[in-house]
Amino acid sequence: DAAHQAAGYGRINILKYLIEERKIFYAVKLDCVATATRFGKLDCLKYLVEEAKVPLTHMVWVAYARYNEHPDCVNYLLEKGCPEPTDEQYAGFVEYERSKSGQQSGD
């Protein structure tokens, strides 16, 4: 979907157009936050939170940013009040991500 690609590649102008002019669904906006955090696109993340008013309600967004080593996104999410995963939740997230990519624990 175009909105996910825009968020993942940091194409903020396209993302703005899709949200403001094409009126994409709320669920797609949530997925765009996940995509922006996964790929470390802080400008897109800020737009989604500050202008598109996507509420930061999912701890998985912090987990995506942390797992993919985007500390600027982690810090931003936490500063804005996004819930942080517990150690147990994060361990489960890591296990799930590794299983998707075929990695084993300890690799």
Put a short name on every predicted segment.
Residues 13-14, 43-44, 72-73:
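Conserved ankyrin/ankyrin-like repeat signature
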Residues 3, 16, 44-46, 65:
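Small side chains
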Residues 16-25, 46-55, 76-83:
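Ankyrin repeat domain, specifically the short helix-to-loop turn at the C-terminus of the second helix
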Residues 71-107:
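Ankyrin-repeat-protein effector appendages
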Residues 1-5, 26-35, 55-66, 87-93:
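Ankyrin-repeat boundary/"N-cap" motif
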